[in-house]
Amino acid sequence: MTIKLIALDMDGTLLNRQKLVPEKNALAIKRAMDKGIYVTIATGRMPASASYFAKQLNMNCPVVSCNGGVVKDLNTGKSIYEAHFSKDTITELISICYQKNWYIRWYIGDTIYVRYVDMDMFPAYKTTKGLNIVEVGEDFEKYTENVTQLVVCNLNGKIQEIQDELANIFKDRIGLQQNTGYTMDITPPGIDKAVGLSKLAQYLQIDKSEIMACGDGDNDLAMIEYAGLGVAMENAIDDVKNIAQFITKDCDEDGIAYVIDKFI
């Protein structure tokens, strides 16, 4: 099997539990790129956070963010693919979340929009510097054009309840994916990491059989199934492990370095 592109989820995969890139992972990524292999991030995070870590690692191709809804060139800052909600859908969605007093954030380009700022609701972003967060208060409707993703944050164990409620209201007008157990990512319909990865592969003229995809969570299932070599972290959920062709070490044990050294 010849691997030409490695796609890495961030939280629980590329990053350890401290939300940092272990040195061994960084060195293994450099070795892979030195061999002419493309290495990218495929994350549910917003573009700015994905780009922040990709630039730290000098990654050599566009990155996939917003669970596949955005594929952005690091050098030009331009999107080679971007999916948006319809204005009607996102307006209705934000309105319902406001009425329910659910804490939400939504992304337009590299900007995060919130009703009010509460950094306790951003635990995954604690190691990303320079985030642009805009507090909009009650006047959200002027910030509903070109929205790529909305995230519901709930630290009280009610994410599944919220997901079921929104699925009942919106049906196939949105995509719903639990991410970390305390957040839920909402995307335009039909979007997942496999979609974003396929757009990147097409851009790079690489066949899916030449892709290695690594992840740990619910939102990684599609790309792990799509890639020629699907890799689960030892800390992955069972659903991911069950479809992966290989299980690597835990994210706190340099699992990405281990799998790169094994297959590259």
Task: Tell me the role of every PLM-derived stretch.
Residues 18-121:
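Active-site phosphate-binding/coordination module
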Residues 4-18:
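Asp-based phosphoryl-transfer active-site loop
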Residues 21-37, 82-89, 130-137, 190-202, ...:
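Short, acidic loop-to-helix structural element flanking the phosphoryl-transfer center
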Residues 36-40, 60-61, 149, 209-210, ...:
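Short active-site oxyanion
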Residues 57-59, 66-67, 169-172, 226-227, ...:
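Short, structured coil segments at secondary-structure junctions
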Residues 96, 100-214, 218, 235:
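Conserved acidic, metal-coordinating active-site core of Asp-based
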Residues 1-5, 21-22, 185-264:
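Mg2+-dependent phosphoryl-transfer enzymes with acidic/Ser/Thr/Gly-rich catalytic loops
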Residues 32, 43, 67, 150, ...:
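Residue-level signal for inorganic ion chemistry
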